């Protein structure tokens, strides 16, 4: 009898997880059942509790497969957001007009309303897509690649965890971290405000940041208490260890002012921004640092090659063979080279410094010149004959030994043009023709 009593008590304490009917009879409120009074908490027969998120994170398993349905969280979040919006409105009305605190409150109100709108919108037809704060998150299918979550800074175990990547800025995070993201996609900043910080490490000090991380506002200090402060060499601001992983990148201001391409430590946000801006031609070197051309010979060579390519472009646009051969597509990676000669991207400066751009651009320049001067009879027919010396060789405006009249675009030998710089025969002829056609007009 004593053994039977122990067996009954054992069965009462250790429930069969697959015996749903018996469990429903014994536990009418399975989600929030108070511990039995018959068995104290310290009793070895008590049912163990497994609701310990800290322990789960220690094991590296951050997915909660026993959480409540998404709809329950959604309703709660919408109610909290509406309450926060009303409180933010009241705060804006109470703050002084045009104050910094009021401006910050307005920005916070905008983000709250955007978040509420995102929750109210119906779900996408494609379940693998999530749109948050202009991020376009796609569910990753890779199970073997291991990355770090940009939000919680822990490993993403693709075999047992669901994770997403933003197609705009390559932001990676767990599925559970999606709703915790507060930073908009940096691609929106690149689209609306495509410019660099041109001051070298513009530091303002931790006091200007209220001793908080510039991105997530976590308290930080240079003494690592409560958290280590890490400086971003691009923005000059300080960040916590979750927002600054000691990534390194080339700083545009150092490259332009010092011709220094040594990578420096930057925050995660700055690294993503610099990566997106790397190929954008937003640097006008003549205005930012015109003296750079006096000290960097490679820049002068590249500028001459680009000027020649712009002079070749009209020949290709009006040449059927060149259009069929798609010669201009050889510069499709640097489209700005066929549009202007003074805009550069940071990638251009990197390639100039390493010598790669000079070699590749010289080959393209040779191919273009060969088509115009040797391969294509139509392009050859558009050449010029020097009207000053009357020699028979055909001249083109991109030849190194020629000069071009600024008024009529006629091409002459450089020596002939400078020896007779007082007058251009073609300009004189055109002026006489105008006088004959319009005798009443003054030349």
From Swiss-Prot:
Any GO MF annotation of the entry: zinc ion binding
CDD domains registered for this protein in UniProt: C1_DEF8
GO biological processes: lysosome localization; positive regulation of bone resorption; positive regulation of ruffle assembly
Keyword Repeat: yes
Residues in Phorbol-ester/DAG-type zinc fingers: 134-185, 364-424
UniProt-annotated stretches for the region Disordered: 14-44
Keyword Oxidoreductase: no
Coiled-coil spans in chain: none
PROSITE patterns in the cross-refs: ZF_DAG_PE_1, ZF_DAG_PE_2
Pfam families assigned: C1_1 (PF00130), RH_dom (PF13901)
SUPFAM superfamilies tied to this protein: Cysteine-rich domain (SSF57889), Multiheme cytochromes (SSF48695)
Keywords: Metal-binding, Repeat, Zinc, Zinc-finger
InterPro entries: C1-like_sf, DEF8, DEF8_C1, Multihaem_cyt_sf, PE/DAG-bd, RH_dom
Family classification: Belongs to the DEF8 family.
Function: Positively regulates lysosome peripheral distribution and ruffled border formation in osteoclasts. Involved in bone resorption.
Name of the molecule in the record: Differentially expressed in FDCP 8 homolog
Species of origin: Xenopus tropicalis (Western clawed frog)
